[in-house]
Amino acid sequence: KELGEAVTLESKEKQEALVDVIRESAVGVRSAVFAMPLSSSFVTNVSIEAEEDVDLAPMVRVEARKVIPASLSEVTLDWAEVELGTDKKKNDGKNRRDVLIAAIQNNALDRFKILMQFAGFKEPPTEIECFSTIRGLYSGQEKHMAIIDVGATSTKLYIAHDGLLMRMHRVRAGGSIATQQISKTLHIDFGDAEEKKISIDRKDKTFADIKRLHDSVYDRAFREFGQVLREYEQKTGADIDVVHMSGGAALFPGTDALLKESLRKDIEVANPFTKVAYPAFMEDTMKNIGPSFTVALGAALRNFE
């Protein structure tokens, strides 16, 4: 595979890669949290008509069968009741209770358990990556926050209320797809296109052309996210306090400005390392790598809750 291409590793290759990373990083602790990728998970919100004193568990399983694209016997299911907002109105006088449903494919869970055991971690807690991302960026100050996570092949929008996930929206758009667009249009190898994308400077004479090709991959996704945010604010009566942009593909010059234009909101490039201590001379490095480490740091912080 070329630099920047999305890749799916075989089990043995995953084991070797994980062991190598742990060894080279000189990590001494033997505890971990596993952040399950969304590709092996499912997260959604449902609204259930029920009185406040009614047990929702059996109703949630009924609703889960409707929305989860797999048999419930094939997934590990979890759920939590959430409050959409203080200004939420009852629909037609009915008592509606909002529930967040999360499910992980059992076969994926089993594969990753074996991977963790191979690396010496015995039954680490597991959560879906969206929850790690929110933990990594939620400061406790924001009532309502949004996160745009720009990945290799998909870009996700998370909306959180008091640090709890309320909405998620995913679109096929990402850094690897942007590189493919540059490669195809300029008739250059994928590796050369990736190198050009990650090293280009605003002063480069080809920057405008590269940026146009790059941004074309995200235009529709960012417009969709803007619509989802506006619908959420209209439904809940809430105002999104802050929008974080995270993910390894978030650092291309001008992506934050493009997102700001689409969402009509100020954008903060994610820096989860504000939650931990590090030497002052590493400040610039932490800011540069922050968007790529949001999930990892957020997962690690789970052990300190």
Predicted regions and their residues:
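N-terminal phosphate-binding loop and adjacent alpha-helix
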Residues: K1-R23, T206-L213, E283-K287
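Short glycine-rich phosphate-binding loop at a beta-alpha junction
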Residues: L18, S25-S39, M116, F121-P125, ...
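Adenine-nucleotide phosphate-binding core of ATP-dependent small-molecule kinases
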Residues: E195-V242, A249
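Glycine-rich phosphate-binding loops at beta-strand->alpha-helix junctions
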Residues: A238-E268, F273-T274
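Phosphate- and other anionic-substrate recognition elements at nucleic-acid/protein interfaces
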Residues: E10-L38, P58-R61, L263, I267
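Active-site neighborhood for divalent-cation/phosphate handling
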Residues: A35-Y138, T274-Y278, V295
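Glycine-rich phosphate-binding/hydrolytic loop that grips phosphoryl groups
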Residues: S132-R135, S176, A250, E268-E305
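Small-residue (GG/TT-enriched) beta-loop-alpha framework at ligand/catalytic clefts
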Residues: A26-G28, F34, G93-E195
